[in-house]
Amino acid sequence: FGKDYAGGARRTAFAIAGEVEDVPLEAMIEREPVTIVCSKMGWIRAMSGHLMLEKALKYKDGDDAQFVFHAETTDKLIVFGTNGRFYTLVADNLPGGRGMGEPLRLMIDLPNDVGIVDLFTYDPKGKRLVASMAGDGFIVPEAEIVAQTRTGRQVLNVKGDIKALLAHRVIGDHVACVGENRKVLVFALNELPEM
């Protein structure tokens, strides 16, 4: 063989490799509507299609609905625990609608003594108002709460009997709070610190 023989000449050239385009993981998942169902005992499932949210669903004995909302298989789901941690799930990885689903604690490292405060779809441009029972609160962009591991991301520091209370989507420009003394406090959203 050699360059002088038929078929012997080099057919490729040496060159610097071109840029490889990053393909997001979501591009490999088929986009389909699902209804996310999470019970009070922490059993989660994704039923295909957007079902009516008022529809009666079956649960284990002594269990009932806690979170039922529409999403898509490409969506990331955020779980907020009473320990102040945010956990991330992919809707495509959830068990189907047949049966009762699977325990959420098998998918994320949520301790047994920690409850679920909120479960919602991730919005990269959204913001959340996070607060604890002690009255501490601040605004956090949703881009800052996505966890890359099963252990979640600590956002709100809580100790002892103090637990995380809420993680509401920020809408509007004012916040209204009702205390245990049944008094209402309304203040501007820009008075809250932002993470």
Locations of regions flagged by a protein language model:
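Short, structured "edge-of-domain" segments at secondary-structure transitions
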Residues: F1-M195
